[in-house]
């Protein structure tokens, strides 16, 4: 790619509650993936010349976590701390991608059913602080569907902060049938911390929570039949796995491996009065027009990091089959790259020639203000 072309390449930035995925439109994977964390020192710096900063972002915050207080500016998919969010965007553009934002149109993503003020403020910061020439805000689940090469289907997107079901027909999201569940990866990590404590292992601090997140990502899986799996775990050691902690201590984990993600299907495990992800998917389909349900049942697309557990697709298939009419054909699509499918969809969308007239330009923003985002982005 010549320098001339690189100038106008769009930037795609998927701001998740847990990870920021960013890169250039047309690429097949994000260039930069780092935790959505801003850390501030808990102690006063005493050594002169150490170049201590008053805040650290992403991987640097993660590596210095022992001396920092870590905060996630995005909670349940909603930006709650704008100053920190600005730091994250600044870090993305200048340190990770090393671009001048005023030269690149920028595509951002957000969770469905977010407060309107959230996307207005995103728009305002992009144009006024970063001076981008153009920008767009896309719904995460819709992008995942693009990435799977479909225009019709129901997306079950589960990330770190929020899970949602979005039925989409011929490229249109059906807002009345969107189901949002504030139960996701972070809650599962907390639950695993809790049940490991019952085994006698203690995990408390924000740093130790990150260790438990790693255990979760490496060892957890979804049981096809929970009761039967519990019986197997009780009668033999075949399901036990060991994990080495950073200090060399080895811990053994058994039924916790599948009890943790079971929460997705039984939110009552963590005291939530809510239907599991299989039921929210079914309810979402039932809120759609009777004529399009068949197409949705046949195109159940999983996306997001919390759908990466082994066994989750088979379990979804089993649970939805039990709820749906008996003659219905049900298909669960679980693409291997689904951890990043929102970003990939954004990369596809931003590089389509037909999309180029969809951008909100700086000129349009100057004329209409932040509310332009509701007119141009659905």
Curated annotation (Swiss-Prot):
UniProt KW keywords: ATP-binding, Cytoplasm, Cytoskeleton, Hydrolase, Muscle protein, Nucleotide-binding
Catalytic reaction(s) noted: ATP + H2O = ADP + phosphate + H(+)
Annotated Gene Ontology cellular component terms: cytoplasm; cytoskeleton
Keyword Cytoplasm on entry: yes
Cell location: Cytoplasm, Cytoskeleton
Primary site of residence: cytoplasm
MF terms in GO: ATP binding; hydrolase activity
Pfam families: Actin
EC number: 3.6.4.-
InterPro entries attached to this UniProt entry: Actin, Actin/actin-like_CS, Actin_CS, ATPase_NBD
Annotated SUPFAM superfamilies: Actin-like ATPase domain
Subunit composition and interactions: Polymerization of globular actin (G-actin) leads to a structural filament (F-actin) in the form of a two-stranded helix. Each actin can bind to 4 others.
Family: Belongs to the actin family.
Function: Actins are highly conserved proteins that are involved in various types of cell motility and are ubiquitously expressed in all eukaryotic cells.
Protein name (record): Actin, muscle
Organism: Styela clava
Phylogenetic classification of the source organism: Eukaryota, Metazoa, Chordata, Tunicata, Ascidiacea
């Amino acid at each position: 790619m010549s320098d001339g072309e690189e100038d106008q390449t769009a930037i795609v930035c998927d701001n998740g509650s847990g990870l920021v995925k960013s890169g250039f439109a047309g690429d097949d994977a994000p260039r930069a993936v780092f935790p959505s964390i801003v850390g501030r020192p808990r102690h006063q710096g005493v050594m002169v010349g150490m170049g201590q900063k008053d805040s650290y972002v992403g991987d640097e915050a993660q590596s210095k976590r022992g001396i920092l207080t870590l905060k996630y500016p995005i909670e349940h998919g909603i930006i709650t701390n704008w100053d920190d969010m600005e730091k994250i965007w600044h870090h993305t553009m200048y340190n990770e991608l090393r671009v001048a934002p005023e030269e690149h149109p920028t595509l951002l993503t957000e969770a469905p059913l977010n407060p309107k003020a959230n996307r207005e403020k995103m728009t305002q910061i992009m144009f006024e602080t970063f001076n981008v020439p153009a920008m767009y805000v896309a719904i995460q689940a819709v992008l995942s569907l693009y990435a799977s090469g479909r225009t019709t289907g129901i997306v079950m997107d589960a990330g770190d902060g929020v899970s949602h079901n979005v039925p989409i027909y011929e490229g249109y999201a059906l807002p009345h049938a969107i189901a949002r569940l504030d139960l996701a990866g972070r809650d599962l990590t907390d639950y695993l911390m809790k049940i490991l404590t019952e085994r006698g292992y203690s995990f408390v601090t924000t740093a130790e929570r990150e260790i438990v997140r790693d255990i979760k990502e490496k060892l957890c899986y979804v049981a096809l039949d929970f009761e039967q799996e519990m019986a197997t775990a009780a009668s033999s050691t075949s399901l036990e796995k060991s994990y080495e902690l950073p200090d060399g201590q080895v811990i053994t984990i058994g039924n916790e491996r599948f009890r943790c993600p079971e929460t997705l299907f039984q939110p009552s495990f963590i005291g939530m009065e809510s239907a599991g992800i299989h039921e929210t998917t079914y309810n979402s389909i039932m809120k759609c027009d009777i004529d399009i349900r068949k197409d949705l049942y046949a195109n159940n697309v999983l996306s997001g990091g919390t759908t990466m557990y082994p066994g989750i697709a088979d379990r979804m298939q089993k649970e939805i089959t039990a709820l749906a009419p008996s003659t219905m054909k049900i298909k669960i699509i679980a693409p291997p790259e689904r951890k990043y499918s929102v970003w990939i969809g954004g990369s596809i969308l931003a590089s389509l020639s037909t999309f180029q007239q969809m951008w909100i330009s700086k000129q349009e923003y100057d004329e209409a203000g932040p509310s332009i985002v509701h007119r141009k982005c659905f």
